[in-house]
Swiss-Prot record:
Required for the formation of a threonylcarbamoyl group on adenosine at position 37 (t(6)A37) in tRNAs that read codons beginning with adenine. Is involved in the transfer of the threonylcarbamoyl moiety of threonylcarbamoyl-AMP (TC-AMP) to the N6 group of A37, together with TsaE and TsaB. TsaD likely plays a direct catalytic role in this reaction. Its EC number is 2.3.1.234. This is tRNA N6-adenosine threonylcarbamoyltransferase. The lineage of its organism: Bacteria, Pseudomonadati, Pseudomonadota, Gammaproteobacteria, Enterobacterales. Coiled coil: none annotated. CDD domains: ASKHA_NBD_TsaD-like. It holds the Pfam family TsaD. It comes from Escherichia coli O139:H28 (strain E24377A / ETEC). GO terms for cellular component: cytoplasm. Keywords: Acyltransferase, Cytoplasm, Iron, Metal-binding, Transferase, tRNA processing. Belongs to the KAE1 / TsaD family. Its cofactor is Fe(2+). GO terms for molecular function: iron ion binding; N(6)-L-threonylcarbamoyladenine synthase activity.
Amino acid sequence: MRVLGIETSCDETGIAIYDDEKGLLANQLYSQVKLHADYGGVVPELASRDHVRKTVPLIQAALKESGLTAKDIDAVAYTAGPGLVGALLVGATVGRSLAFAWNVPAIPVHHMEGHLLAPMLEDNPPEFPFVALLVSGGHTQLISVTGIGQYELLGESIDDAAGEAFDKTAKLLGLDYPGGPLLSKMAAQGTAGRFVFPRPMTDRPGLDFSFSGLKTFAANTIRDNGTDDQTRADIARAFEDAVVDTLMIKCKRALDQTGFKRLVMAGGVSANRTLRAKLAEMMKKRRGEVFYARPEFCTDNGAMIAYAGMVRFKAGATADLGVSVRPRWPLAELPAA
């Protein structure tokens, strides 16, 4: 069975084709980073217009890459939420229209379920059950996963997501958008211990996160210590260490609470090398395993949507003729497969 996946939830247009026997047959991606860089963040209207321009050509490119035609596609999956409503509507409209024209099922996919299942695309996929750390620009969540659609929210950010805090702090340090990866690169040149940032909400029970205060702490540290290159690098190092330590502490608690031996990292921030190294070290000490997708599948992409669509299609999920999206869509509302 072959599923075409369409991802347009934010500022990446991702198209992929997944075969349940052969794996990933095609993967096309267009990033709008340069388009939004001058504005310091994603402009929803510009994102939607660019998806309109790029989605169909990328579908054609994916078919060409795979050597397939429309007749070879068994279902069309598209991101139905959460995300920017205009951007979501582009992918949903194209996906639903193609499914109708090709006379195949249309499968609405939850964007965060796509991220959560992205490590399943690797050669050594995780088995259930596991604790999932979904960490991106829009979400920071700890989830108990016992099967497809069997998701229990253990904790989440009560304000800024970790990725959002990275980008905002990077902007304070004078870095371009998107600043998260640039901040991490700068942090690698920083001196550990010169500045010590707090580890928010680790001094109390629970699995929720709060990262907005770290941005304020960074702003005050910059104000009080100047902006020479080494100071900026030291501040970046202190900030990244604080975020990584906070995530690690909460992951430990979640693993203790569930008793699970497997940890899955997903979302854009899961590509962070420091976070990967620290969590890998932690799981080795616990005699457990950590899983994550390759870096290009940590950020938004069509491959994860094609795979999640295939899983949902096998479980009997389909869409009606209407085109509907959900900009806000709790993961816990998904049915079990």
